Design a protein with these regions (language model features):
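Short, low-complexity intrinsically disordered segments enriched in A/P/G/S/L with frequent Arg
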Residues: 3-4, 9-16
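Rossmann-like AdoMet
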Residues: 13-105, 109-153, 159, 166-167
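Hydrophobic/aromatic-lined pockets within catalytic cores
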Residues: 44, 182, 198
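Short amphipathic alpha-helices and their capping/turn segments at secondary-structure boundaries
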Residues: 91-94, 190-196
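A conserved beta-strand element that flanks and buttresses the S-adenosyl-L-methionine
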Residues: 172-173
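Hydrophobic adenine-recognition pocket in adenosine-nucleotide-binding enzymes
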Residues: 177
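A short, conserved alpha-helix within the catalytic core of class I
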Residues: 180-193
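Conserved beta-strand signature within the Rossmann-like core of class I S-adenosyl-L-methionine
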Residues: 196-202
Length: 202
């Protein structure tokens, strides 16, 4: 099964190779788990028939000063994770097709390259949200792009949603974050999202 889309000319023009020196990695706890998911996506990109085909992830791991052997991950594990990510990408594209002028909020973005894989149009506002140390690392290895903003905060902190205008349909992506939330925190987060945005999807 190959769910990887063909990269458009605009996406091909984007390169992460502007980083001249490797970036050190100092992460712990839940934030460190994002290294495994990034590496699995990079391994998938090397397959003859990739599921995700995330060449941005492959470029990103080359920018990090990290011994990937520490993860003890083999390529056979990659499909277990990339199938889920590819399905989320499909849902995002469907939402963007239905709402060309919209907002996307990606909770617990980690080092995921979704905004680059999707390459949303000029009328889409995209927010990637994660712990401050994660956002600091993203800023070092990924380029900026129009209508793209990073928010450095734990998802459970109240108030950060106020930074996001509520004037258009909004999609909340929460791939891989629910296991780190208590039931009360998860319910409270969803309620704040519902109260803030009148039209959207989770």
């Amino acid at each position: 099964m190959n769910l990887a889309p063909t990269r458009r000319a605009g996406a091909l023009a984007l390169s992460l190779t502007y980083v001249s020196e490797k970036v050190s990695v100092n992460l712990s706890g839940p934030a460190k788990t994002m290294l495994s998911t990034l590496y699995l996506k990079a391994l998938d990109a090397d397959f003859d028939r990739p599921i995700l085909g995330d060449l941005f992830a492959k470029e990103a791991i080359d920018k990090l000063d990290f011994d990937w052997r520490e993860l003890e991950i083999t390529p056979k594990w990659a499909p277990l994770f990339t199938v889920r990510t590819a399905q989320y990408d499909i849902w995002v594209r469907e939402f963007l097709a239905a709402h060309p002028e919209c907002t996307v909020v990606h909770l617990g973005c980690g080092l995921d390259c979704r905004v680059f894989r999707i390459d949303p149009g000029a009328d889409v506002r995209w927010y990637d949200v994660d712990f401050p140390q994660v956002i600091a690392l993203r800023e070092k290895i990924y380029p900026n792009r129009p209508n793209y903003q990073l928010i450095a905060t734990p998802a459970t902190e109240p108030g950060w949603l106020d930074q996001i205008p509520a004037d258009r349909p909004t999609l909340l992506i929460a791939e891989g974050i629910s296991m780190y939330l208590t039931e009360d925190d998860g319910i409270a987060l969803l309620q704040r999202f519902i109260d803030r945005f009148g039209i959207g999807e989770v």
